[in-house]
Amino acid sequence: MQPLTRTICALFCLLLTLPLTFGSPFELEPRRNKLKIGTRIKQRRPTYAIAHMVLDKTGVKDAIKHGANALEIDVAAYRGGWWADHDMKAKSKGWSLESLFQVIAKENKHIAFVWLDLKTPDMCTGKKCNKKVLQPSKCKENEKCSMKSLQQLTRKYLKPAGVRVLFGFYKKHHARSAAFDYIQKSLGDGEAVCLSGEANKVMEIFKKEGSKIKPQRRVMDYGRTELPNGFGDCNEKGGKTCAELKNGAKLRQKGDLQRVFAWTSHVGEGKYVNKLLDKASVDGIIYGFAKTRYYHHKDTEKSSKDIIDRVKKSKSRYMVTGADKLW
């Protein structure tokens, strides 16, 4: 074979191997597009529509049908264990948490986390209160009414299913309770603590009473039962709902908090939802009835739709699924 012929053959073989090594030139543009799409997804903020006062199986199923990707459950301790219970009165009692968690675990593709709103660091003392409700801080660790028992239930049913857990403490003095102290010392994978209040006060509590809780497990919430009351215009320095949540979002950006949630949006309050998502930059919103357990109704469905529709229109947000990791 002549030298020139050999050279031509060698160059031809080299050209044939280039697509195998570096990819075809025709594939480069689609590959660039995929990278751009992946980058955009990472930059979008995961968003949560959190169904309010889910106390039974019906509430779980209906919330999922409405598009909820997280559930807020009010919980109270009884001698026989933990129950979904909003105000510790006979009419508000729902399912046992053991039964409810089993239902939720099966819906792990839809539910990213469960927010356990602890009602019993404070005791209900009125005449109408259920005297069977116990103070978990006074229960021994091996008793079913203890905080350890509650945590074990979440780890038995929710953790294996990949459903995250948020332990919510509503009042400032709850952070000085034995229940709070136990949880902060025993936080595990997929678990976080939420404190309710103004941004600077929440941070103060986390730094003092909750110093063992890492920033990646700190969550703040703020709101009102009637969202329009004290909402503000989002431009105040603080003291109003939107402004305080906006302050919380700034702390999140600094790395002091992991998530910031607002509450509670009802039907017809879409303009407030828009401001919470667009101006306050919250991570999620509790929605639903103000004082009634969750169930299928045009009002719960519409209030869920307010959140979901706004997220769909946004280029900077997406609705979370059970596959997303919050903390």
UniProtKB/Swiss-Prot annotation:
Binds 1 Mg(2+) ion per subunit. It catalyses: a sphingomyelin + H2O = an N-acylsphing-4-enine 1-phosphate + choline + H(+). Mg(2+) binds at residues 72, 74, 117. It comes from Paracoccidioides brasiliensis (strain Pb03). One of its GO terms (biological process) is lipid catabolic process. GO terms for cellular component: extracellular region. CDD domains: GDPD_like_SMaseD_PLD. Residues 1-23 form the signal peptide. It is found in: Secreted. The lineage of its organism: Eukaryota, Fungi, Dikarya, Ascomycota, Pezizomycotina. This is Sphingomyelinase D. One of its GO terms (molecular function) is sphingomyelin phosphodiesterase D activity. The keyword Lipid metabolism applies. Its main location: secreted. The SMD-tail motif is highly conserved and may be responsible for structural stabilization. Coiled coil: none annotated.
